[in-house]
């Protein structure tokens, strides 16, 4: 079991205004620790962040509602299933993410994803075969009639990984095909750009839209020659639905 509490404070000043963002973080995780060959596997985590973005000193900001921008970000991730003889896993991965904004804007955005998959690990092979089913839900701001997270994606995405140790430590081969939809939050944008302010185009910012990765395919090989020369070659191609 893992439990953490944290605080994030970002206080900035530029030529237009000074503002501050303060957030409290909570993280909780439980997972299976079973030495048996066959058992029920679980690994689940919960993350929550409550943040308040100050308005700063701009004249237009002084007319905004008290409390500036309040953010609530909740993320749950879990993997559950059966392990058979420590080499086969029949799993279901769950991912639920919700962001609720209040005061300056009133909007809620959420993504739900479920990924059934089979994992095989024996001998030279480590293989994962799965497919992610993802759904998006959001509401428009009732005051300004805009929607932060608009991109819906395609619902079904691949989740396939193949790793083969053809000649262990000398020639290893990897291939993968993945995809998915990711919710971009105000707090993550603020961590990337400390000077970002809610009035710097928040309602029309593509940076806050969902990121839709339609597919990401690639592979590679690595190893060594005679224990003296190391090599690692990778290749891939990714296509985004809203980039």
What does each model-found stretch correspond to?
Residues 5-11, 48-54, 96-104, 120-124, ...:
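Transmembrane beta-strands of outer-membrane beta-barrel pores
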Residues 3, 94, 111-113, 126-130, ...:
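Extended beta-sheet lipid-handling architectures
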Residues 2, 35-43, 85-92, 122-129, ...:
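Repeated loop/turn-to-beta-strand initiation elements of outer-membrane beta-barrel proteins
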Residues 67-111, 116-118:
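Eukaryotic alpha-helical scaffold "rod" segments
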Residues 1, 26-34, 76-86, 114-122, ...:
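Residues on the lipid-exposed face of transmembrane beta-strands in outer-membrane beta-barrel proteins
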């Amino acid at each position: 079991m893992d439990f953490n509490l944290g605080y994030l404070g970002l206080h900035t000043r530029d030529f237009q205004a000074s503002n501050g963002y303060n957030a409290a973080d909570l993280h909780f995780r439980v997972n299976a620790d079973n030495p048996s060959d066959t058992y029920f596997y679980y690994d689940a985590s919960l993350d929550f962040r409550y943040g308040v973005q100050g308005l700063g000193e701009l004249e237009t900001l002084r007319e905004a509602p008290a409390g500036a921008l309040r953010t609530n970000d909740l993320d749950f991730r879990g993997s559950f299933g059966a392990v058979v003889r420590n080499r086969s896993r029949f799993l279901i991965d769950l991912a639920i993410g919700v962001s609720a904004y209040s005061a300056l804007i009133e909007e809620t955005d959420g993504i739900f994803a479920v990924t059934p998959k089979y994992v095989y690990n024996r001998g030279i092979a480590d293989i994962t075969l799965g497919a992610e089913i993802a759904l998006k839900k959001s509401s428009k701001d009732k005051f300004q009639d805009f929607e932060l997270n608009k991109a819906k994606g395609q619902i079904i995405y691949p989740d396939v990984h193949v790793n083969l140790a053809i000649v262990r430590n000398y020639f290893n081969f990897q291939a993968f095909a993945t995809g998915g939809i990711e919710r971009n939050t105000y707090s993550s944008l603020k961590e990337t750009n400390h000077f970002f302010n809610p009035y710097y185009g928040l309602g029309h910012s593509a940076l806050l839209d969902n990121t839709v990765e339609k597919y990401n395919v690639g592979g590679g090989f690595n190893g060594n020659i005679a224990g003296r020369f190391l090599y690692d070659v990778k290749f891939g191609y990714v296509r985004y639905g809203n980039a």
